[in-house]
From Swiss-Prot:
The modification Phosphoserine is found at residues 254-255. Transcription regulator that may syncronize transcriptional and translational programs. It comes from Homo sapiens (Human). Keywords: Nucleus, Phosphoprotein. The protein contains a transactivation domain (TAD) which may be required for transcriptional activation of a subset of target genes. Residues 348-430 are annotated as: Required for macropage invasion. Residues 1-114, 133-300 are annotated as: Disordered. Disulfide bonds: none annotated. It holds the Pfam family Chromosome_seg. The keyword Plastid does not apply. Belongs to the ATOS family. Residues 227-238 have a biased composition (Pro residues). The gene is ATOSB. This is Atos homolog protein B. One of its GO terms (cellular component) is nucleus.
Length: 538
């Protein structure tokens, strides 16, 4: 057996004792010790052994390699820190022994320092540890190997004691004695292949001296080798198989507690892999919420003729909704002709005076100075009153045609009861301009003898210009509105009749009655509501 020390220290004289193995003599303060045996026996053609060790803390002088006598057959005791050399042969299985660096049958080199030993066969790394539990707590342990020893820093993070011949674990587990074929070591070149960068996880305790837990590669974590997620492996190729995936395919990652990955369903092929970007444990709970193409659900009723009819009816109901979304212009087919519209629109016919009376037109200006004198006659004659008139004019024509004026007489200054009139009689309203000239005198005859108490109604008196000879059956389109008077009547709870609210008038700028050359005549029309004629007070 030949040994090579990576970092030798100055040699020192060994103590007297039995025959030493043919190795370099001297205390090793820290480094790497490798050995090679060309003829390892029938069981192994070649043996490589590697030992990584470091000096204990608090030592000032180098330790010397000595041979130690076999201890007595007492219980497990503390492992001495002093230098010593012992032989592995003849020791009982339960007692700790010195570190053996030679073959299974040859003597071993005892190093009185904390060290790590590996036996390599092929590309598997096996770590050997001691079974003495007291040696973990007694004494001051040495720090990890110096940074110069790259193999120690990259393979382990803590020191281990030497193993016993029986291969007992450090926690008392006894998986059985290791066979001699497992105690091979690795050469320097092969050992460099086992070194990995970064931190390596601490080896499990009590697994028969193995750096990694001995599990069946097919059942690790309940997964098959193809579904085992990539992670930090043991030094050297691990027996776990890894499947090489194409560049465009993502690996199937699943939780350790969920067991083997189930077969993907047909409907989930369109969804992206949810476990690539988030926790795999939550994947079964929210992956169905991701948007994706939905597969049509087959309904057993669709196979029969009745199912096809229902489907067709559903499409007919949804077709108008789709056309509404596209736009109103697509509702009618392009071949259908549009509805013919009349040349002259009559939708606003009769609404012009209503719009003026209700003030829907924007006024162009106001004129002050108009007044109105109100009087009535009948069973009694109330006193005449004169009230101001608010006059507003409008610009509703592009030509120079005269625009009507709107006058409003407010009756609120007369009191809450308004202007009292008899139930049957005549109302006279005379309009004066700012020059106190009569613009128009309105005479309206009324009969509200049948009007119940607490009701109201109105009268609308119009003056039209109609062609001569058509007074009785004049066409409404041939009539021209000249004046309009709107009166509101109300009966009190006692049955007394009065004018209330306001009085509204429509008139023109100039008097059309003076134009004698026109072939038209004035026609008065008084209208009242009917069906119902009277309405109750609010």
């Amino acid at each position: 057996m030949r040994h090579v020390q990576a970092e030798p220290s100055p040699s020192s004289e060994p103590e007297a004792g039995p025959s030493q193995p043919p190795v370099r003599q001297g205390a090793l303060q820290g480094g790497l010790l490798m050995g090679y045996s060309p003829a390892g026996g029938a069981t192994s053609p070649g043996v490589y052994q590697v030992s990584i060790f470091s000096p204990p803390a608090g030592t000032s002088e180098p330790h010397r390699a000595l041979k130690r006598q076999a201890p007595s057959t007492e219980g497990p005791r503390e492992l001495k820190r002093g230098p010593g050399l012992g032989a592995r042969e003849g020791l009982p299985p339960e007692e700790p022994s010195t570190v053996g660096l030679l073959g299974p049958e040859g003597p071993g080199l005892g190093l009185g320092v904390a060290s790590q030993h590996f036996s390599h066969r092929g590309l598997c790394v096996v770590e050997q540890r001691s079974s003495v539990t007291s040696s973990w707590t007694s004494g001051a342990w040495s720090p990890p190997c110096p940074p110069s020893n790259a193999s120690c820093n990259t393979l382990h993070t803590r020191d281990w004691a030497s193993p016993d011949p029986g291969g007992q674990g450090s926690l008392g587990e006894s998986p059985g004695p290791a066979p001699p074929g497992q105690l091979h070591t690795l050469d320097t070149d092969l050992h460099s292949l086992a070194q990995i960068g970064g931190k390596s996880p601490v080896a499990g305790v009590g697994n028969g001296g193995s750096l990694w837990p001995r599990e069946s590669p097919g059942t690790a974590n309940g997964h098959s080798p193809e579904h085992t997620p990539p992670g930090p492996g043991p030094p050297g190729p691990c027996p776990t198989k890894r499947r090489l995936l194409p560049a465009g395919e993502a690996p199937d990652v699943s939780s350790e507690e969920e067991g083997p990955a189930p077969r993907r369903r047909r409907g989930s092929l369109g969804h992206p892999t949810a476990a690539n970007s988030s926790d795999a444990k939550a994947t079964p709970f929210w992956s169905h919420l991701l948007p994706g193409p939905k597969e049509p659900v087959l309904d057993p009723t669709d196979c029969g003729p009745m199912g096809r009819r229902l489907k067709g009816a559903r499409r007919l109901k949804l077709s108008p909704l789709r056309s509404l979304r596209k736009g109103p212009g697509l509702l009618s087919p392009p071949s259908a002709s549009p509805v013919p519209t009349p040349a002259v629109s009559r939708t606003l016919l009769g609404n012009f005076e209503e719009s003026l009376l209700r003030g829907r037109f924007a006024p162009s200006g106001h004129i002050e100075g108009f007044t109105a004198e109100i009087g009535a006659s009948g069973s009694y004659c109330p006193q005449h009153v004169t009230l101001p008139v608010t006059v507003t004019f409008f610009d509703v024509s592009e030509q120079n045609a005269p625009a009507p004026f709107l006058g409003i007489v407010d009756l609120n200054p007369l009191g809450r009861k308004g202007y009292s009139v008899p139930k049957v009689g005549t109302v006279q309203v005379t309009l004066f301009n700012p020059n106190q000239t009569v613009v128009k005198m309105f005479l309206v005859t009324f009969d509200f003898s049948d009007m119940p108490a607490a009701h109201m109604t109105f009268l609308r008196h119009r003056l039209f210009l109609v062609p001569v000879g058509e007074e009785g059956n004049a066409n409404p389109t041939h009539r021209l509105l000249c004046y309009l008077l709107h009166l509101r009547f109300r009966s009190s709870r006692s049955g007394r009749l009065s004018l209330h609210g306001d009085i509204r008038l429509l008139f023109s700028r100039r008097s059309l009655e003076l134009d004698t050359g026109l072939p038209y005549e004035l026609q008065a029309v008084t209208e009242a509501p009917h069906n119902p004629r009277y309405s109750p007070l609010p």
